[in-house]
Amino acid sequence: MRLLQGSFSMPNAHNRPHVFIVQADLPRLKTDAWLLPCDAGFHVLSSWIPQEYQAGLAQRNTDTYVLPVALFDEWTSGRRRTVRHNDWPGRSMPWLTNVGGGSKYEVAWYLEAVSQFVEEASTWAKAGLKRSRPLLGVPAVGTGFGGQWDKKAGVIDALFDHLVELGRLHDVDIVFTLFDPQSFAAAQLARKRRVEVGSFGWDLDSHLLASATALAERAKAGALVMFLGSGVSVGAGLPTWRDFLGRLADQAGLSDSELEALQNLDAMDAGSIVERYLGGREALEKSTRALLDTQECSLQHALIASIPHEAAVTLNYDTLYESASKVVVGDVAVLPQERNPRAKRWLLKLHGCVERGDLVLTRKDYLRFGERRSALAGIVQALLITKHMLFIGFGMTDPNFLRILDDVRRSLGDVSNEKDLSHPIGTVLMLNHDPLRNLLFDADLKMESMASAHAPDSARQLEIFLDLIAFRSASTTAFFFDSTYDALLSAREREFRDALQNLHQEFAEDRPENIWAEFEKLMAKNIKE
């Protein structure tokens, strides 16, 4: 095993704590615990509080709410700056943390608050541990209304270093969560500099390091599309397809023997049986909505959304991918219902959406799919032929998708005996080794197993793999025209930036029309990226 271009200073170590970086909405991200910024009076900005929770809170003003937490001596004196807030609607546990210091405080003051949070939250999270180690969420404290907004670069740079050390000290994983593309790019640049000097790396086997880097190159070239299976949503607390059927069957009152028989049926036939036991279509859809009722994305959703891509395909009914992507690119066009040519990303939902009442759950649904099924299959076939498809959380057992894959295989020419993987049409990320399944697809798809003797948690290895793709494909120039990130630019880079801005102003009134539009695009790309 080796680390990418740089590693932690500890030789021959494996399965170490990791700091992930995502562009995401932290209150909507599934973690074991997360830092909820507030001030000494427990005042919290409305952007941190889900709308379903705001109704019962007192408002300080139009943008700020007061959380119902009693003041205590250690808090008012400033000795303690973090406290668990149990009364929260989500599954992830927020810790109110006082980071509202204003401009009078230096960066170290914010880092101390983060230290208190990680120390207390890690101890609490380990008591009910479900992952191999706890996952804590931390935002870029101090860079908004916390008082250091004009020095974002220095805060983000110092905070990333601090999170790496805290993760090692308390044996926890941390997801550093940035809301806008500028701060996300700044965090990735901070990490890049640590990689270059050997103080940060990814604990992955060498073949996975190479595969993730190759996929990142495809993403940067606009050649990568995603295929999301139910495994992606498991980290958000949603069931796999097998568990989903099992829970529906429990609600329908099936016996253990009937449930066992149900699991052996084709998915659509199993759905038909459950529908009958539940009492009809309306009851089936109601139960489905209840089982998929969560507003928190998994870490995999956030990592996938942070990787550049324009299109994705899924059999999932939930809307978590859409929520995760909205933070990065705005609203996602969901096909086949929505046609939004302005959308920067679109998602093809082959089996419908829980919010639209068009779920494909039963054999009757599938048969009624009719001509639309053929049209949607054609879109998937085109993506497989023209792009490289990355399969995540998908077991490669769905008969409808396998039919699509077979059509593509035949259209490209059956090379099943040649075993030529120089140009695979896709990559499948698997949690475990499955040699027999590999034989079925190894002429068309690259099969990557996350299983490792050094890292027993394959799901966590998958997250680290996706984090590496996100890092290798991330822009590090999105903040170029934002002066609050000047600390990340060299003197020469700042000089070049200022010259571009002066040039833009100089010719704004008397534009050379034939090239001005392209120049505007260049400026806008780096401002909004």
Which role fits each region the language model picked out?
Residues 5-16, 24, 164-226, 232-234, ...:
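SIR2/sirtuin-family catalytic core signature
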Residues 38-78, 227-268, 324-329:
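Adenosine ribonucleotide-centric catalytic and binding domains
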Residues 11, 26-27, 39-40, 44-46, ...:
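Metabolite-binding pocket within alpha/beta catalytic cores that recognizes anionic/polar moieties
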Residues 341-361:
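Class I SAM-dependent methyltransferase SAM-binding "motif I" and its flanking Rossmann-like core
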Residues 2-130:
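Glycine-/small-residue-enriched capping loops at alpha/beta junctions
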Residues 46-50, 146-160, 238-241, 325, ...:
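Short Gly/Thr/Asp-enriched flexible loops that form oxyanion-binding sites at enzyme active sites
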Residues 155-164, 210, 363-379, 404:
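Active-site glycine-rich loop that binds ribose-phosphate moieties when present
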Residues 99-202:
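Phosphate/ribose-phosphate-bearing ligand recognition and processing surfaces
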